[in-house]
Amino acid sequence: MKSFKNKNTLRRKKAFPVFTKILLVSFLVWVLKCSNNCNNGNGSGDSFDFRNKRTLAQKQHEHHHHHHHQHQHQHQAPHQAHHHHHHGEVNHQAPQVHQQVHGQDQAHHHHHHHHHQLQPQQLQGTVANPPSNEPVVKTQVFREARPGGGFKAYEEKYESKHYKLKENVVDGKKDCDEKYEAANYAFSEECPYTVNDYSQENGPNIFALRKRFPLGMNDEDEEGKEALAIKDKLPGGLDEYQNQLYGICNETCTTCGPAAIDYVPADAPNGYAYGGSAHDGSHGNLRGHGNKGSEGYGYEAPYNPGFNGAPGSNGMQNYVPPHGAGYSAPYGVPHGAAHGSRYSSFSSVNKYGKHGDEKHHSSKKHEGNDGEGEKKKKSKKHKDHDGEKKKSKKHKDNEDAESVKSKKHKSHDCEKKKSKKHKDNEDAESVKSKKSVKEKGEKHNGKKPCSKKTNEENKNKEKTNNLKSDGSK
């Protein structure tokens, strides 16, 4: 600081004082005002400024002993200001006034005697400024990084088969070990899908998945037709799923057939995360099924076409896992939705732990996991089939929200009639009519996953294929 005294000050005696006086006063006022506004709660901003000024004052004191009383004031002002500051908003003007006066004094004082003080003070003011000026707010949102892709392990039990399946989220390949147990159909999953938020891979649409496993169908008695093949009783069957897509008639829907599907344009504005380009023509009709899932969470990352499994296979949505596994809908189809679904984006892998089995097992209301539709989807309520018809309008809205997720394309009356509570029934209904379409998917996909399927089942498959051709065409 001393170096300023001899050279610089003499050279700039004329312009420097006036300029700095103005600058300093306004600067002090501004700092004070700002720190009062920004940091009312904690005196930290002020104490920082004043501490700096006090040290300056002491330094000045050392250099120039002839201005004791001026410094006396300078020392006082900070304490006064502090005092007011800590006692709330009322006295905020006081520190400002004091400080301004003293700032001016000081400026005058320097103006006549030694300008070298000004420069350092300016610098120190600048240093003191950011703490009082910018509240320290971390604006960065930290998201937990999750392992990319990952596996979903779930079990399906129906009649005498028990499959433990593990499906790779990325390429849709399943592996499973098949056990034989006497059990009615049940679906349980070990833990939710995990998807890497940063790479924006799309896991399966959990909402659609849940809707396809309502756990307890008794179509046979209701339809008066012959008993269905096992795989047609499975809520996860492709028939049922595609029936949701293609809107085949059932009791609740007035409009039927593909006409009832509401295709969503690729650039749909409503914040669903479809990546428009990721759909080719053949899968356009799958678009939007279940996509509402992403809406509630505002996670709109676009589908990332680079994520597709085999080159040319258009990714997961082309992979229609074969019928044998009971859960045979193409996982990735409504690909946007997995982003927003609570499972894929917002839960860590082990959060729900491996207790999934117990939780989902006999269709206990398993899901603490997903507050949304899942409790209802899994609950046993769907056992009564009239439930479908009398679905309460009370839940209409929820239902719409939920059911649009995976049923966008069914006619709207359909959606309205269903209450979230009976989500499952909705599937129950659809299974009825969905049997047929499942075949469609399966036919051009003839792989059987873990299929040690019995002959009886294959026979039944043929049976329902015929059913399909009558029913759905």
From Swiss-Prot:
Compositionally biased intervals (Low complexity): 95-104
Signal peptide: 1-34
Major localization listed first in the record, in broad terms: secreted
Biased composition (Basic residues): 57-87, 108-117, 406-422
Region Disordered: start-end pairs: 57-143, 347-473
InterPro entries: EMP3/KAHRP_N
Keywords, alphabetical: Glycoprotein, Malaria, Repeat, Secreted, Signal
GO CC entries: extracellular region
Annotated Pfam families: EKAL
Superkingdom, natural source: Eukaryota
Residues spanning the membrane: none
Glycosylated residue positions: N42
Basic and acidic residues bias (residue ranges): 354-375, 396-405, 423-444, 453-473
Compartments in which it is found: Secreted
Known role: KAHRP might mimick human histidine-rich glycoproteins to anchor host thrombospondin or a parasite analog in a binding complex with the endothelial cell receptor.
Name assigned to this protein: Knob-associated histidine-rich protein
Taxonomic source organism: Plasmodium falciparum
